[in-house]
């Protein structure tokens, strides 16, 4: 068991904060792990964390303490998650991405760029791993829908769970990346697609929770082992007070959804730290469902609580550090996860074992499929040279097949939902056109009646009548 690593970062005072409150701050520095903060009753409270980063801390300080151990574990096959949390405008996205994902000096680069560099440096320098691969996915949770930032046509992805993968986002685009440059270009594309908006507290406020997902897989030179790890970086949207942000309209709706999901996150943390693990409301929001493994499963986790140092934001900063204090009590059980069976296609000397496993799989499939379908699959296995590792059981491969089927069903479900929306739009358009047609028919009937009475030409020019009725297929003689 291990605790979630929790750090607090105070950003420098902004120009607006200095103009309003001068250099007054809401905390008193003690050391690298503790500070004093006044609560609602103006009483001094000492808060302690794994590390406190004050205004003069560098981006590299945050990365070296918070992220380096998680990257090392991911390369060793243990999943890791890093979450930035805090009030809107507190520096979460700056800590995660820096001022720009592509164009900023080395000193200011954020956690994302540094994780990418560390991953490829470690993998390329490893002598024990003969082969490796890194895949990148990037999604956002916007208005409680999971959207693929690398393929905007996928705007309602489903969250699934399996024995081999744990919690995963079904159908999310996975891009194979070969080096840091490829990764940053891909990340830049995803960031450009992210939902942002302007508020009184932040000119480029994130309106969604963003997840950067790096999947690492390696094969050993000494044996046939293949191990995989995953790093998930989570840039949460900030909690907001409407009276401070001035949100209205759609921005207000976004704020309500953001605050609700963060409230559920707080409920999950409370449930995990108050001795009621059987009643953890992971499914109450998309965010907590995705973070289920990080907070209560087999992943190593770290939390960076970002705070404004200004006295004007003291209530929000106090709420943030209290959330960090509760999160620090969570215990997880990090362990290595085997990669998906269907991703392992490497030569294995024991052909007898391969054939035996293939036959057992086909026999199992015969229980649920037609005989002719199984025969076609057998031909496909032989023609395509699909290899089965005898080290994996039928149950393992069956689980992997079920995962693949679940992903396909998710994509089909999404397509059906999109078709339903299209049908609804066409139905509305059809009703509108039907109404216009009825009006045109009434106008044509009235015109015919007026003409019969010899009164039409006395008050409406014939040209005007022709122009009015021509779009509907009625042209007066």
From Swiss-Prot:
Coiled coil among keywords: yes
Membership in a protein family: Belongs to the TRAFAC class myosin-kinesin ATPase superfamily. Kinesin family. KIN-1 subfamily.
Gene Ontology CC terms: cytoplasm; kinesin complex; microtubule
Family annotation (PROSITE patterns): KINESIN_MOTOR_1 (PS00411), KINESIN_MOTOR_2 (PS50067)
Tissues in which the protein is found: Widely expressed. Expressed in young roots and leaves, in mature roots, culm, sheath and leaves, and in panicles at various developmental stages. Strongest expression is detected in panicles. In the panicle, expression is detected in anthers, glumme, lemma and palea. In the spikelet, expression is detected in both microsporocyte and the anther walls.
Protein name: Kinesin-like protein KIN-1
Residues binding ATP: 86-93
Residue ranges of domain Kinesin motor in the record: 3-330
Pfam families, sorted: Kinesin (PF00225)
Result of altering residue 289 to H: Diminished microtubule-stimulated ATPase activity, abnormal chromosome congression and segregation and reduced spikelet fertility caused jointly by reduced pollen viability and defective anther dehiscence
Recorded coiled-coil stretches: 402-451
Subcellular location: Cytoplasm
Keywords: ATP-binding, Coiled coil, Cytoplasm, Microtubule, Motor protein, Nucleotide-binding
Protein origin, superkingdom: Eukaryota
Main location: cytoplasm
GO molecular function, one term: ATP hydrolysis activity
Function of the molecule: Kinesin-like motor protein that exhibits microtubule-stimulated ATPase activity. Plays an essential role in male meiotic chromosomal dynamics, male gametogenesis and anther dehiscence. May play a minor and nonessential role in regulating meiotic spindle formation.
């Amino acid at each position: 068991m291990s605790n979630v690593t929790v750090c607090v970062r105070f950003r420098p005072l902004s120009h607006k904060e200095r103009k309003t409150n001068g250099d007054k701050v809401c905390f008193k520095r003690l050391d690298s792990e503790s500070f004093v903060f006044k609560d609602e009753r103006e009483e001094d409270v000492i808060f302690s964390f794994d590390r406190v980063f004050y205004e003069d801390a560098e981006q590299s300080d945050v990365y070296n303490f918070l992220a380096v151990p998680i990257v090392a574990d991911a390369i060793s096959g243990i999943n890791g998650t890093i979450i930035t949390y805090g009030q809107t405008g507190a520096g979460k996205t700056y800590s995660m991405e820096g001022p720009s994902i592509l164009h900023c000096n080395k000193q200011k680069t954020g956690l994302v760029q540094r994780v990418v560099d560390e991953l490829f440096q470690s993998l390329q320098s490893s002598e024990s791993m003969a082969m490796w691969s890194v895949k990148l996915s990037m999604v956002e949770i916007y208005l409680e829908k999971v959207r693929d930032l690398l393929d905007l046509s996928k705007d309602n992805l489903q969250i699934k769970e399996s024995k081999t993968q744990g919690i995963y986002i079904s159908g999310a685009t996975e891009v194979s990346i070969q080096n840091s440059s490829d990764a940053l270009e891909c990340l830049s594309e995803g960031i450009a697609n992210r939902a942002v908006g302007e508020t009184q507290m932040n000119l480029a406020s994130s309106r969604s929770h963003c997840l950067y997902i790096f999947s690492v897989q390696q094969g050993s030179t000494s044996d046939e082992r293949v191990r995989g790890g995953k790093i998930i970086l989570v840039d949460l949207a900030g909690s907001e007070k409407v009276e401070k942000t001035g949100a209205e309209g759609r921005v207000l709706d976004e704020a309500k959804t953001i605050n609700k999901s963060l409230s559920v996150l707080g409920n999950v943390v409370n449930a995990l730290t108050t001795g009621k693990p059987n009643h953890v409301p992971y499914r109450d929001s998309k965010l907590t469902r995705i973070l289920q493994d990080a907070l209560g499963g087999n992943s190593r986790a770290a939390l960076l609580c970002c705070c404004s140092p200004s006295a004007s934001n003291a209530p929000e900063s106090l709420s943030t550090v209290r959330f960090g204090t509760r999160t620090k009590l969570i215990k997880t059980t990090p362990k290595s996860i085997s990669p998906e069976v269907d991703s392992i296609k490497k030569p294995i000397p024991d052909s007898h074992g391969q054939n035996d496993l293939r036959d057992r799989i086909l026999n199992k499939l015969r229980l649920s499929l037609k005989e002719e379908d199984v025969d076609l699959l057998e031909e496909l296995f032989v023609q395509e040279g699909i290899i089965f590792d005898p080290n994996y059981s039928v149950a393992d491969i069956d689980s992997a097949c079920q995962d693949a089927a679940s992903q396909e069903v998710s994509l089909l479900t999404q397509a059906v939902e999109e078709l339903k929306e299209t049908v609804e739009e066409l139905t509305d358009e059809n009703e509108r056109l039907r109404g216009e047609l009825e009006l045109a028919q009434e106008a044509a009937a009235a015109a015919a009646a007026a003409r019969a009475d010899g009164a039409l030409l006395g008050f409406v020019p014939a040209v005007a009548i022709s122009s009015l009725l021509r779009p509907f297929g009625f042209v007066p003689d």
